[in-house]
Amino acid sequence: MNSIWEQAEALSPQIIAQRRDLHKFPETGWTEFRTACIVIKKLRQLGYIVHFGADVIDGSAMMGVPSEVSLRKYMQRALNEGADAELVEKMQGGKTGIVAVLDSGKVGKTIAFRF
């Protein structure tokens, strides 16, 4: 495979399967525990240094956070759907944000993408 298009085409079935899986288990804002676990594991697998939970989210700046009772319900739902218990526990209070760092070893600018 030479071109990026050929590489993307080869990954297409995996990407489609992942998208369909995520759509089977929709999660609203501050309750994306299952999705965050999937993203964290994939980023680590790809070699990123991953920070999440209270390390990257300022709880005092969060708006529209569900009640603690609701958050507990969504955390349990994520666990029932296969989320990693250790990761979910670190996202207490709906702190489902993730920051991934890829150190290229080269001097230069830092680029951030937010999704």
Where in the sequence are the language-model features?
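Acidic/His- and Gly-rich active-site-bordering loop/insert found
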Residues: 2-115
